[in-house]
């Protein structure tokens, strides 16, 4: 754990460089422009997020199953891909200059002036609820830029191949924890 309140943790070398390469290879040909939720509508391109994504079902891809097992061993969290357990893996590629603006993962919506417009009736509610925990495994190291930054606690984590960053999006009362607002800085190299 690198921060206790709000809880943010980092595992070094959770997966091997070869496992990271395998995941990237599987995803590369299936990536699409990442949709971004702006005002309750998904847009395929936004100045708020520039990336490509591929959704990977851990039950169908042996490499994803292996990563899921490692996450379970490290955290004891049940990642069974069921309605109320976890989402499909999201393999993201931000590329050079790619970024994501400040947001909360638990709302699934853009943050304007530090607040969310989510009233609890979003798509999240329709598919079983909020994302309580985010677990991000870095599949590449980045020489310049690319850090995941948390402005309120004033910290950023540089991507390192195989490391895994996690944080809790919701507070003890099942409320959005605004201290976990975060962004992905532009990658330069």
Residue ranges, per PLM feature:
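Fe(II)/2-oxoglutarate oxygenase catalytic core
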Residues: 1-189
């Amino acid at each position: 754990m690198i921060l206790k309140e709000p809880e943010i943790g980092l595992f070094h070398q959770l997966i091997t460089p070869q496992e990271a390469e395998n995941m990237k290879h599987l995803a590369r040909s299936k990536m699409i422009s990442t949709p971004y939720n702006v005002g309750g509508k998904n847009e395929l391109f936004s100045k708020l997020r520039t990336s490509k994504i591929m959704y990977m079902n851990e039950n169908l891809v042996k490499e994803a199953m292996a990563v899921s097992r490692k996450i379970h061993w490290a955290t004891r969290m049940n990642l069974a891909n069921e309605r109320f357990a976890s989402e499909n893996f999201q393999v993201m590629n931000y590329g050079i200059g790619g970024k994501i603006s400040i947001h909360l993962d638990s709302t699934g919506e853009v943050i304007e002036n530090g607040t969310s417009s989510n009233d609890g009736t979003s798509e999240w509610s329709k598919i079983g609820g909020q994302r309580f925990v985010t677990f991000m495994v870095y599949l590449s190291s980045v020489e310049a830029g690319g850090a995941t930054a948390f402005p309120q606690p004033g910290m950023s984590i540089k991507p390192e191949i195989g490391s895994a960053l996690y944080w809790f999006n919701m507070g003890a009362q099942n409320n959005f924890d605004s201290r976990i607002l975060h962004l992905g800085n532009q990658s330069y190299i």
